[in-house]
Swiss-Prot record:
InterPro entries named among the record's database cross-references: Rbsml_uS13_C, Ribosomal_uS13, Ribosomal_uS13-like_H2TH, Ribosomal_uS13_bac-type, Ribosomal_uS13_CS
HAMAP family assigned: Ribosomal_uS13
Keywords recorded for this protein, A-Z: Ribonucleoprotein, Ribosomal protein, RNA-binding, rRNA-binding, tRNA-binding
A biological process term (GO) from this entry: translation
Source organism (scientific name): Thiobacillus denitrificans (strain ATCC 25259 / T1)
Single annotated GO MF: rRNA binding
Protein name: Small ribosomal subunit protein uS13
GO cellular component labels: cytosol; small ribosomal subunit
Keyword NADP listed: no
Disordered as annotated region, ranges: 94-118
Assembly, per entry: Part of the 30S ribosomal subunit. Forms a loose heterodimer with protein S19. Forms two bridges to the 50S subunit in the 70S ribosome.
Family note: Belongs to the universal ribosomal protein uS13 family.
Function as written in the Swiss-Prot or TrEMBL entry: Located at the top of the head of the 30S subunit, it contacts several helices of the 16S rRNA. In the 70S ribosome it contacts the 23S rRNA (bridge B1a) and protein L5 of the 50S subunit (bridge B1b), connecting the 2 subunits; these bridges are implicated in subunit movement. Contacts the tRNAs in the A and P-sites.
Gene: rpsM
Length: 118
């Protein structure tokens, strides 16, 4: 298994798919990284030379990924909560943030139903 950005990349997958194992890199970004590195998207990770792997590592290092990205997202949410704005309040209460209805259909965000005590 190859390691890029502290993540073990699966050897048997195509390069464009294998790069999506890194948090913060999806299909579009991985395609751009492969294109910039001059690697065919259909080539498998196990078939790449060490020089090609190094070009992939350089391409990935230009993006904010893994721990840094997780920390950045967490800090953005914390900042909203500290500001006391509407979005921060919704995060704090564990409710949908982007205007969805909550009378019904908010179970994912609200969690399991709580029984009403009589």
């Amino acid at each position: 298994m190859a390691r890029i950005a502290g993540v073990n990349i699966p050897n048997h997958q195509h390069a464009v798919i294998a790069l999506t194992a890194i948090y913060g890199i999806g299909r579009t970004t991985s395609g751009k990284i492969c294109e910039a590195a001059g690697i065919a998207q259909t080539s498998k990770i196990k078939d790449l030379s060490e020089a090609e792997m190094e070009r992939l590592r350089e391409g990935v290092s230009k993006f904010t990924v893994e721990g840094d990205l997780r920390r950045e997202v967490t800090m953005n949410i914390k900042r909203l909560m500290d500001l006391g704005c509407y979005r921060g309040f919704r995060h704090r209460k564990g409710l949908p943030v982007r205007g969805q209805r909550t009378r019904t259909n908010a179970r994912t965000r609200k969690g399991p139903r709580k029984a009403i005590k009589k």
